[in-house]
């Protein structure tokens, strides 16, 4: 029996190029004892804490595999609760970045979280429609509240009462009594999803945001308080209501459930609406910690800021209004007006301050009000930017001023092409708006150059220049020392889909959507602005084809050129004469990527039909077809000096294969969305990949050998554990699903723990039987048994 081939394991080395994931939220945290100086944002599975003043990353809260979805800082500012895509919640210390507590209860992504006033309890809502209350101090789940029919969008503790209010995509707002753990009131006045909620005016009012441009305002009156204080002035009870609002209230009250038995805790009635300027749905609606400022935004780039008057300010305004009304009455020499007619409108109590216009679509925000009356707002934008604004509320006309912007460490759009320099040190990444050069060891961005929509790229031999092919058919040549664009050439009439450097390094070849393959040579031309000559490129030959060209590759000896066409075939031509040599057909959809091995014997093709085919370059025969990914194969590249190759797929996975044994070696999992491209370093030690999740990931080859049988066994175990965790709870005859339940969920750990308990009970029973037998024997022998 021969020795099995030894493979080396690739492991994740770093995540970079990402400032904040648009799928998570932003939360202001304290840095160096200063509140509002730091901002925590979800970054794929990790959480990054940025110093807004310096624009630096100061802390990474490392996650496991699942994407971070929701962040909630504790009231003391020392901890951060992070909810993940799989429903788990981890509580991190902001002092050392360690995860102290893990809660497992939800079956789907966490969508909302909030601490109570003291930070002892945490409530979480999820896409699985459940709400769970957790005991942070005892590190355990208290109970699960069931009632929503769709994802929970917001959860709020009431500070004074032991009550909870939750909203969901099922259009319902539910009130829960946490003493009895049941829902005692359901607001059904909304016709669309309730996307956000906020409690204002010392928890006497509730504001809800839905799919339209109205923010609905509801008055909360606690029944016990009304019984205690029957002499409450009428003006206080009816403040802010208007004839229009009263009509709305009547309409909405008819929609409310008949809950007369449960009206003993509180009443909730609609008093009117605040109109937003945005026409689309509310994405985030929140107040600052003091409850004085309300802000909301939709799916656009505008944050609307409102000021909420306190009880004292409302009273003062009401008195002023009464005085004015009396003066008017005297002037008209009429009888005195009754005071009850004077009341404040809702717009006077909740006043629009200003709008903050961000540079791109807002995905999340957080804000903090300083004692001096200055509002600090931080925005997480869709295009991988974090912006902070300052708003002086004491000014006559408050205007938002941008205080800081964190953007240099990432691209604004998806990276579509990557390349390694010949010395394995520099990494090129290019997107729709810029080309960035990164230092591989420090992961710092050392150059940023504006470009058009980039599709392909490479380092020019010598690593002093780079060439980028664009969607508009241009070739752009950049000088790295100066970071400037040296030359732009209109190369193709359509997109430049592929570019390949010739093995002799004297030129390169491009393939485009204009059905042409063009051959280029490097040349030195005189520069008018300099004495020295500069690098340029000239077209030397052209190969016209019948279909769009998607990918081009040279064989290592430069004798053959492989061209992938839109008709799902790969044509092989002789480079010198451009005569046709072979046609590789068999893919059902176009070949998006391909590569030729270092010895020129094999060509591997990856297609949109999810398959990878390995062909011999001598006769064009297909050695093997491999089902590689669950979606299109986007990129394929051989490891230097070997027949091993990597593929990247739209399913978010990167896989390594053996082209001789036709075996899958390992899967590099980390990206949460489609992987667009990857690049291997010339020495094969590093892999860099780019994804739709805006992250760039670096993978490193270790010296650790990888045994295929062990890998398969580990994969089977992981699949089994996942299937066990997904199994539903057993249905017991005659038992109905209650409104509350246990907070935990079945995982492989809980199953193992239950089995250990069962084993211990079994052992105890066996030992008790033995003890009884021993006692009986001793009794028969007349011996005394101690204990």
Regions from the PLM with identified roles:
Residues 13, 58-59, 98-101, 140-143, ...:
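A structural motif specific to WD40 beta-propellers
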Residues 14-45:
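Beta-strand-rich domains and repeat architectures in extracellular enzymes and scaffolds
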Residues 16-24, 62-68, 104-110, 146-152, ...:
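WD40/WD-repeat beta-propeller blade N-cap
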């Amino acid at each position: 029996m021969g020795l099995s081939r030894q493979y080396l394991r690739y492991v994740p080395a770093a995540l970079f190029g990402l400032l904040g994931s648009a799928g998570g939220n932003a939360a202001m945290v304290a840095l160096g004892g200063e509140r509002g100086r730091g901002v925590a944002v979800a970054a794929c599975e990790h959480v990054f804490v940025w110093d807004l003043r310096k624009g630096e990353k100061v802390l990474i809260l490392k996650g496991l595999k699942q994407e971070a979805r929701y962040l909630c800082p504790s009231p003391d500012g020392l901890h951060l609760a992070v909810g993940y895509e799989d429903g788990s919640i981890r509580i991190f210390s902001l002092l050392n970045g360690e995860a102290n507590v893990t809660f497992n209860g939800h079956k789907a992504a966490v969508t909302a979280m909030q601490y109570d006033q003291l930070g002892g309890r945490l409530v979480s809502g999820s896409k699985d429609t459940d709400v769970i209350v957790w005991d942070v101090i005892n590190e355990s789940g208290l109970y699960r509240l069931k009632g929503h029919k769709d994802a929970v969008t917001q959860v709020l503790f009431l500070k004074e009462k032991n009550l909870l209010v939750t909203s969901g995509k099922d259009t319902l707002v539910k009130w829960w009594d946490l003493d009895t753990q049941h829902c005692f009131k359901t607001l059904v006045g909304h016709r669309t999803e309730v996307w956000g909620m906020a409690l204002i005016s010392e928890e006497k009012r509730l504001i809800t945001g839905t799919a339209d441009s109205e923010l609905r305002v509801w008055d909360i009156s606690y029944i016990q308080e009304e019984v205690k204080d029957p002499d409450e002035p009428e003006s206080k009870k009816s403040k802010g209501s208007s004839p229009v609002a009263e009509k709305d209230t009547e309409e909405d009250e008819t929609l409310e459930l008949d809950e007369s038995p449960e009206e003993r805790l509180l009443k909730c009635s609609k008093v009117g609406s605040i109109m937003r300027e945005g026409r689309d749905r509310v994405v985030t609606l929140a107040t600052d910690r003091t409850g004085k400022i309300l802000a909301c935004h939709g799916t656009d780039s505008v944050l609307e800021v409102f000021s909420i008057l306190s009880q004292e300010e409302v009273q003062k305004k009401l008195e002023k209004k009464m005085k004015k009304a009396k003066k008017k009455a005297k002037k008209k020499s009429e009888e005195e007006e009754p005071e009850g007619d004077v009341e404040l409108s809702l717009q006077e109590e909740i006043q629009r301050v200003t709008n903050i216009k961000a540079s791109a679509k807002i995905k999340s925000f957080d804000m903090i009000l300083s004692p001096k009356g200055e509002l600090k707002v931080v925005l997480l934008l869709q295009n991988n930017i974090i912006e902070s604004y300052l708003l002086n509320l004491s000014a006559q006309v408050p205007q938002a001023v941008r205080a800081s912007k964190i953007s240099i460490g990432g691209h604004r759009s998806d990276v579509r092409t990557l390349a390694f320099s010949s010395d394995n040190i520099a990494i090129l990444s290019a997107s729709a708006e810029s080309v960035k050069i990164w230092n591989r060891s420090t992961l710092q961005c050392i150059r940023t150059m504006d470009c058009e929509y980039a599709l392909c790229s490479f380092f020019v031999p010598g690593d002093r220049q780079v060439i980028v092919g664009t969607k508009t058919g241009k070739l752009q040549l950049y000088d790295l020392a100066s970071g400037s664009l040296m030359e732009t050439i209109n190369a193709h009439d359509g997109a430049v889909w592929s570019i390949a450097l010739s093995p002799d390094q004297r030129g390169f070849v491009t393939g485009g959507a204009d059905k042409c393959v063009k051959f280029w040579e490097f040349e030195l031309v005189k520069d008018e602005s300099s004495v020295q000559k500069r690098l340029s490129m000239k077209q030397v030959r052209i190969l016209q084809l019948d279909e769009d060209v998607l990918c081009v590759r040279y064989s290592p000896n430069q004798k053959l050129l492989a061209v992938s066409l839109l008709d799902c075939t790969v044509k092989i031509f002789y480079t010198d004469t451009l005569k046709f040599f072979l046609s590789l057909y068999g893919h059902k959809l176009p070949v998006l990527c391909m590569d030729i091995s270092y010895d020129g014997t094999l060509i591997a093709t990856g297609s949109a039909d999810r398959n990878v085919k390995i062909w011999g370059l001598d006769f064009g025969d297909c050695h093997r077809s491999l089902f590689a990914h669950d979606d299109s194969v986007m990129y394929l590249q051989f490891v230097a000096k070997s027949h091993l190759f990597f593929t990247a797929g739209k399913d978010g996975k990167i896989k390594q294969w053996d082209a001789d044994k036709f075996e899958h070696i390992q899967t590099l999992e980390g990206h949460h969305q489609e992987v667009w491209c990857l690049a291997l370093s010339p020495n094969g030690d590093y892999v860099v990949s780019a994804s739709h999740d805006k992250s760039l990931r670096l993978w490193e080859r270790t010296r650790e050998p990888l045994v295929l049988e062990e890998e398969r066994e580990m994969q089977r175990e992981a699949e089994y554990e996942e299937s066990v965790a997904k199994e539903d709870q057993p249905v017991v005859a005659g038992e109905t699903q209650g409104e509350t339940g246990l907070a935990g969920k079945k995982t492989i750990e809980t199953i193992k723990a239950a089995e250990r308990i069962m084993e211990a009970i079994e052992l105890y029973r066996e030992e008790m039987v033995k003890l009884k037998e021993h006692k009986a024997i001793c009794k028969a022998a007349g011996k005394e048994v101690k204990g």
